[in-house]
Amino acid sequence: MTVVRYDSIRAAEQCLRETGGNGSASQTYDVLRAVERCFWRCLAYFAFRHFAYALSCAFGIRRPFRIYAVCDGKGVVLCAPLHLGADGVWSVVAGDFVELDFVDFLYARRGLPELAEAFAAVMQRMRADGICSVTWRYLETGGVTSELLKCQPHETTETFANVRVSFAGGAERFDATLPRNARSVERLARNRLRREGRSVSFSFRSSTGLGEGLSGREPRRLLRECRRVYLGRQKRRYGHGGWLARLFFMHGCYISLSVPGGSSFVAVLRVDGRVAAYMEGYVNMARAALEVPRIAIDDRFARYSPGRLLIAEAARWLCANSRLRCIDLCRGDERYKLDLGGTLYETATVRVGTGGAK
């Protein structure tokens, strides 16, 4: 296998877009794009020339960026996007800097022995380039990298709880398996809305052809309204919400910048024409899942349990209109996620040495 190094995203894109010449690395663009579609995490890495990165440069906190691609005769086997420390001897897998909830190398659909060979090759190349350690933040335990790391020393410093809601049996099965408490809360909320004469509407938009589209003036206006709700929630919960936070969340983070990107999805619950709850994320066809790192409610409508209503309705809508059978609610093990039949899994911060000189 051949390991190719790129010291900027622009250089990587330019090389990968070429056809002919320069061996297999120059012919792997289509393969890499296929990997990108399967692993939505790549959107943040290869769309990194955006506001958040520019802002970090302006404030002098830019970290050098590097991409390693491991190729064979069939195409890209592994892609490792990294931020390097100022001294160039430590690295962090890219993604968490733009609030990505899953961070990992990108792997093609190959057998574990091939992936292990590619992993060993990229670690050897990093060692030769003077990188002494690699850190994953929010690495999913039980994934390919976790499996590969079983064979070598590594350090896990912290873990994070995550929740996903599955409905593989379809909408009827989903409703039947909901805990009694979740069914009664939803019924109470709907009855309350009806009794008070509130108008209720759900809308589902994506850039993948599911539901309505995300391009145009009206969707942009809707997204601005949704993100104001999210910013309000962030300020109440964490004390964030100044002008810099507003600028970042409205324009800079990876979810905002995915619109109208290749796999973004937005679901909205309106009560009397106002956004009561919304969730925003990505379609991940490799997992047949909707990944939702961002969900928020307007506290003025909290008595109607809008978050629960939206997630449950989204599950039913996805069953009827797509092949997606999971909503991954990402970090956080809040009660409402578990009440909807969610199951817990972990991500972790993991550090591994390459064997290079420190």
Which residues are covered by each model-predicted region?
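A conserved beta-strand-loop-helix scaffold within acyl/acetyltransferase catalytic domains
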Residues: V4-S91, L139-S146, K150-T157, A176-R303
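Residues that flank catalytic or metal-binding motifs in active/ligand-binding sites
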Residues: L78, D101, T159-A161, F265, ...
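Acyl-donor binding region in acyl/amide transferases
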Residues: G85-T157, M285-L344
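Short beta-strand-to-loop capping motifs
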Residues: Y107-R110, V165-F167, S206
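Short secondary-structure junction motifs
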Residues: I131, G197-S199, S264, L324, ...
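Conserved catalytic-core motifs of GNAT/GCN5-like acyltransferases
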Residues: T157-V165, L344-G355
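Active-site-proximal, glycine-rich beta->alpha crossover segments in alpha/beta enzymes
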Residues: T159-N162, S166-R180
